[in-house]
């Protein structure tokens, strides 16, 4: 069972990761139940209406966990549903694992004057009760360990290289070179830095979010196309000459792998997430000057980008997830990890 506050129709790396993991676990022979806000009464998050927040979910959460009786329970998010599942597990003496997907302390600080130490204390409390906390990169693992987090293990991310693959540059009729941004358009994503950087060609923004209207008005020369999905997203991405990843707060950045799978190099700041994903000078460029990184990335070999992505399929990511659950079993965790005879992913 996977419990998550982030699920469809949200569009973000957490949802993609969990959906792909659930699907691949099903292919490996497990019955998977995803418990998401879809199954509860919800209200829209005041600052981000696309996010639905469950209302008083504890009783229904307890009922669903008890009815499914999972051999392994993974709490993927620290939201209302994650807290309800955590509370039930602790009350019933059930072991569980968690994962650290989002740098909430930095996100919160970008929106309100909340000190980092307070946010990290809350996250230590949440994850500290789990048997393992799954983290996507070595850099974030070290940062969390330095802040007192325990039982941290690696769970890398993946990319669908059948959907994301090189395509015709002619798909986009824009002046070259084309620098693309892909993702939510929100203050914590630092999209304004990308839009403000000097660039001789075109800027393409693929995505949507609460900051879109303001940024689109401020940067009329940029092309905003909204969210794109599947092969349509891949076609837009493959037609770009470089993808720019301006975020300073992501734990990984799935779009980096998606760009590489399309043969498109990435320009990013040298911070946690990109440091672990981008091979500087081979699949992208890391630089404190984002425009300089983007210009240098234009000279990189698309074949090297594609080769990096081919080593990071979702099957590999899910096998690592499975192995971490199995390692808990070897350390005498009370629940067991074993395949069910049927495959069912709901939520």
Model-inferred region functions:
Residues 168-206:
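Conserved donor-binding/catalytic core segment of Leloir-type glycosyltransferases
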Residues 248:
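Aromatic "clamp/platform" in nucleotide-sugar-dependent glycosyltransferases that forms part
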Residues 95-97, 106-125:
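Nucleotide-sugar donor phosphate/pyrophosphate-binding loop at the beta->alpha transition
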Residues 298-339:
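A charged, aromatic-enriched C-terminal amphipathic alpha-helix characteristic of glycosyltransferases
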Residues 121-167, 173:
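Donor nucleotide-sugar binding/catalytic pocket of nucleotide-sugar-dependent glycosyltransferases
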Residues 127, 235-240, 321:
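Short alpha-helical donor nucleotide-sugar binding micro-motif in glycosyltransferases
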């Amino acid at each position: 069972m996977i419990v998550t506050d982030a699920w469809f129709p949200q569009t973000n790396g957490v949802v993609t990761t969990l959906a792909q993991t659930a699907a691949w676990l099903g292919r490996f022979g497990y019955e998977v139940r995803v418990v998401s806000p879809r199954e509860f009464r919800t209200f829209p998050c005041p600052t981000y209406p696309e996010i639905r927040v469950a209302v008083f979910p504890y009783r229904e959460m307890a009922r669903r966990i008890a009815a499914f009786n999972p051999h392994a329970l993974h709490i993927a998010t620290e939201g209302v549903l994650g807290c309800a599942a955590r509370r039930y597990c602790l009350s019933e003496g059930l072991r569980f694992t968690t994962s650290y997907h989002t740098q909430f302390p930095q996100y919160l600080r970008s929106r309100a004057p909340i000190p980092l130490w307070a946010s990290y204390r809350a996250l230590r409390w949440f994850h500290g009760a789990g048997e393992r906390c799954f983290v996507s990169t070595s850099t974030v693992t070290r940062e969390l360990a330095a802040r007192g987090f325990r039982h941290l293990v690696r769970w890398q991310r993946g990319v669908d290289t059948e959907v994301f693959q090189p395509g015709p540059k002619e798909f986009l009729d824009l002046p070259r070179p084309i620098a693309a941004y892909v993702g939510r358009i929100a203050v914590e994503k630092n999209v304004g830095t990308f839009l403000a950087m000097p660039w001789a060609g075109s800027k393409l923004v693929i995505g949507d979010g609460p900051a879109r209207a303001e940024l689109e008005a401020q940067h009329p020369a940029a092309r905003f196309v909204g969210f794109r999905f599947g092969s349509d997203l891949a076609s837009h991405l493959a037609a770009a000459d470089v993808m720019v990843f301006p975020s300073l707060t992501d734990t990984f950045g799935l779009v980096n792998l998606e760009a590489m799978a399309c043969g498109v190099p990435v320009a990013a700041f040298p911070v946690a997430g990109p440091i672990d994903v981008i091979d500087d000078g081979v699949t992208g460029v890391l630089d404190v000057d984002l425009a300089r990184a983007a210009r240098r990335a234009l000279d990189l070999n698309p074949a090297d980008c594609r080769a990096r992505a081919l080593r990071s399929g979702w099957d590999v990511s899910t096998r690592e997830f499975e192995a971490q659950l199995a390692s808990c079993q070897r350390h005498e965790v009370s629940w067991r990890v074993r395949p069910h005879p049927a495959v069912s992913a709901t939520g």
